């Protein structure tokens, strides 16, 4: 990650599809800001969305250390879902942001429930993607979605945005059942999907790029 080559296949998949200079990117499940900083470095305006308080704090620290890039990044400390309000969130106090295992309790989390037995539960604010647009956010040209099993919840809350604006989607899918349901939803919305980094895909996780080009 420090070398800047982590998840390099994501950026290779974008090449030729989107010029990010001047583009608007939503980094949903921004973690500590790795992808947000890269998007900003490529010239994009970035809305970084991260509900985990430890991750969000580290993201803020990274923005302070990178003021030139930080000018193009805004942090929104909420979870994206299919409803506006609050939802239960599973978060490990021991991780302090080192892991991306936190998730909405309603999500199809990728790991065995026992793995999360020691995690804390708290209520976090939630927002639909469509609501963000209604509140005046500029529609994204690209959405990176990595929400640990809440992918379907997030996309259901953005049906209008996806149907009308057709942003390019980079999705990390986290549950084998979600892979089926997400494909159904995106096909209905006019998207085609392509598997990325297939050699490293596992039954509980894979990466796809979805476009309506």
Language-model regions, residue ranges each:
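Glycine-rich adenosyl-binding loop in Rossmann-like folds that engage adenosine-containing cofactors
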Residues: 1-12, 76-135
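S-adenosyl-L-methionine
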Residues: 1-72, 114-123, 133-137, 204-213
């Amino acid at each position: 990650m420090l070398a800047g080559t982590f998840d390099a296949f994501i950026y290779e998949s974008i090449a030729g599809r989107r010029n990010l200079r001047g583009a608007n990117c939503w980094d949903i499940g921004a973690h500590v800001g790795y992808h947000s900083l890269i998007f900003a470095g490529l010239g994009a305006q970035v809305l970084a969305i991260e509900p985990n308080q430890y991750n969000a704090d580290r993201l803020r620290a990274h923005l302070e250390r990178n003021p030139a890039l930080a000018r193009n990044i805004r942090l929104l400390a909420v979870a994206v879902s299919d409803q506006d309000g609050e939802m239960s969130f599973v978060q490990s106090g021991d991780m302090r942001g080192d892991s991306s295992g936190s998730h909405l309790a309603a999500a199809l989390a990728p790991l065995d429930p026992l793995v999360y037995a020691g995690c804390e539960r708290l209520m976090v604010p939630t927002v639909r993607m469509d609501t963000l647009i209604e509140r005046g956010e500029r529609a994204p040209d690209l959405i990176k979605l990595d929400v640990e099993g809440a992918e379907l919840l997030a996309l259901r809350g953005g049906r209008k945005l996806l149907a009308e604006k057709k942003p390019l989607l980079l999705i990390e899918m986290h549950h084998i059942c979600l892979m089926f349901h997400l494909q159904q939803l995106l096909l209905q919305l006019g998207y085609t999907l392509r598997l990325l980094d297939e050699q490293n895909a596992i039954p509980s996780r894979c990466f796809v790029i979805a476009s309506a080009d």
